[in-house]
Amino acid sequence: MAAAMVAAVHGVGRQDRSSPGGGGAPQVDTGKYVRYTPEQVEALERVYGECPKPSSLRRQQLIRECPILSNIEPKQIKVWFQNRRCREKQRKEASRLQTVNRKLTAMNKLLMEENDRLQKQVSRLVYENGYMRQQLHNPSVATTDTSCESVVTSGQHHQQQNPAATRPQRDANNPAGLLAIAEETLAEFLSKATGTAVDWVQMVGMKPGPDSIGIIAVSHNCSGVAARACGLVSLEPTKVAEILKDRPSWYRDCRCVDVLHVIPTGNGGTIELIYMQTYAPTTLAAPRDFWILRYTSGLEDGSLVICERSLTQSTGGPSGPNTPNFVRAEVLPSGYLIRPCEGGGSMIHIVDHVDLDAWSVPEVLRPLYESPKILAQKMTIAALRHIRQIAHESSGEMPYGGGRQPAVLRTFSQRLSRGFNDAVNGFPDDGWSLMSSDGAEDVTIAFNSSPNKLVGSHVNSSQLFSAIGGGILCAKASMLLQNVPPALLVRFLREHRSEWADPGVDAYSAAALRASPYAVPGLRAGGFMGSQVILPLAHTLEHEEFLEVIRLEGHSLCHDEVVLSRDMYLLQLCSGVDENAAGACAQLVFAPIDESFADDAPLLPSGFRVIPLDGKTDAPSATRTLDLASTLEVGSGGTTRASSDTSSTCNTRSVLTIAFQFSYENHLRESVAAMARQYVRTVVASVQRVAMAIAPSRLGGQIETKNPPGSPEAHTLARWIGRSYRFHTGADLLRTDSQSMDSSLKAMWQHSDSIMCCSLKAAPVFTFANQAGLDMLETTLIALQDISLEKILDDDGRKALCTEFPKIMQQGFAYLPGGVCVSSMGRPVSYEQAVAWKVLSDDDTPHCLAFMFVNWSFV
């Protein structure tokens, strides 16, 4: 009876109650409730595990197959499953709420600690301010001061003095001396992570919360550059430490980490002597290397600490390896403080503080090495994001892409990024050698006759390099860009591959993966390239990076190009396309793959990398889509806001690095080199044209440079469009309470239907579109002017327009039947109806034609 009472908990429902029956079967009475025995509950639970929501036929089958359920009505079985699903949902919701509550509790603790740290910083700044006031009010002290310290020296300045100046001499070439350095490093790191040793300024846009990445801050007025992060993850401290120590897995600029010595300490910690190499981000600077002491230890409160610093002449200690062509940089006391959270998970404090020897690079590139925001994006935020990604994958809630586990897809991303870095840097110890130049130094050509050493033993490279001998050739170049947001440029290159890519070169790269021989192509304009289809594979938790497969549909032009008629596939990695991420590097890397897409497939990555050279202002930048006052206005009609936005963006600079890799057979090396050199020059020219088109699009006062003579300002055009529509049709197009020109422009821009204008010429081209129109055409305001009306309409649409065109010119408007058009990416778009009308200027002369596609959607 006791067992039956326990089992009743599983059976209580809206319509069943237990009654104490014997014989193991429930006794259904005239009431509404039934009591289930343990055997019956076990049978029901077994079916629930297989199918939580069985159909009526399945429930009847269950009663027939289980004699112990034969005396229960099918309706009661249905109620049991309903209640069971309800209890499961409640359990999951309760668990989720408990998790959120733990996160909020931990975040509250983190914010309180951050508030205490900021209070200390405020107190110190108040003290220093008073000290400065005292010095300014006592000029006589300044004139009579003969000490070596300046009168403006503050407490902060004293803190930033090199501690080596007061450190007593010691022998750091033994374990005791190294432990002393390690303990000093630990103390200095903790003072940065939780104290006020560095003035931290929070990065814009990084808001704390239960689902946010955490609190991100960068240094202000300190030696070197530093970044700091605090966040919560649902992994235990030991697992977090293991991930952070595996730096190449999350720091994309890390080439190698060699642990040369491991020394256990008496307190249970370890000291490691590490040599690390990092890639150069561009072809215009040398890579960096580091000689580091890393100290891992536990604190009394149960926290785990991993701290590190460079061993230099001032710190003492053994000398590290010296590698030619690398510039020795310095890690100042940095590390990770990992604290366990109540209920599971960890609270992480990350500090990265480095001196990258910026004076050794050309002056124009120094911002790459002097920007704490770039350091934060590349190292600090990258580490925290990687840990959060692993935690999310470990939870089992992340769907697999293409049938592959997240770890496999992550390996593909790492291989693409690493292969591109290898191509940009071209290290001699990987087998790279420079080819003689043709006299112009704009494109560098390097070749690698030992590709198996570069590709790696774990990759099947037999299909990539023929038995008669061959290798890899890389053509690369770097250039400076002005006024081009990196994210916007990379996004355009991704979405409009046909604007810069040569289909013959793509086919050559794809043919290298096949057994058939191939010839070196001649460059051609346009070519056979069909549509581009993007197949998503995976993305990171915050969508700052995504992996995808690109299918290029090929259409051969003649019989001798049969090899080109096959579809081609690219594995592509895109990152940094968020325009609001300060200091973020935007990158587009791709490699040809075959249809099998094996895990060990060889990859020859090529692509683009754009890095900002100037830090962004703290004010959020205007987006291209809806800062109408700055994006769409023209000439002197720009508002004050447009002027201020222009001043904040008109001087931005970035460095673009391009690298393309090709496999070659030995007897074709010179031909491939000539093709690669010319191809990269062609790509550079294409990117420059795109950059020139994109650059003014964000500068409100300069947008007149792309408009034809006589073009009206955007708000005037919006007024003409709305007024002409009302004049011809008698209906209002723009519903706005205000009569101001700005409100009309905003209403048209936000209109749900696609509205676009085209010129009154023999071959009409689009001159303007609202946001819905740009979305439908899958283009931008700049690229819009390269799209003709005839290009987007199908045969039926063109016939309908030709039939109604005289009516449009005579009566001013016409309704066109619904149909299908195509976007600039080749995707079909259906619409219920189209309206065409003549747009009249203030003097009633025809200015352009306007079209509105009603209720459009992608097919």
From Swiss-Prot:
Q: Which Pfam families does UniProt cross-reference here?
A: Homeodomain, MEKHLA, START
Q: Name one GO cellular component term.
A: nucleus
Subcellular location as annotated? Nucleus
Question: PROSITE patterns per the record?
Answer: HOMEOBOX_2, START
Q: In which tissues is it expressed?
A: Expressed in seedlings, roots, stems, leaf sheaths and blades and panicles.
Among the GO molecular function terms of this UniProt record, one is: DNA-binding transcription factor activity
UniProt keywords (A-Z) are: Coiled coil, DNA-binding, Homeobox, Nucleus, Transcription, Transcription regulation
**Coiled-coil region:** 100-129
Task: Check the record and name the CDD domains matching this protein.
Answer: bZIP, homeodomain, START_ArGLABRA2_like
Q: State the family named in the UniProt similarity comment for this chain.
A: Belongs to the HD-ZIP homeobox family. Class III subfamily.
Q: What is this protein called?
A: Homeobox-leucine zipper protein HOX32
Q: Can you name the source organism? A: Oryza sativa subsp. indica
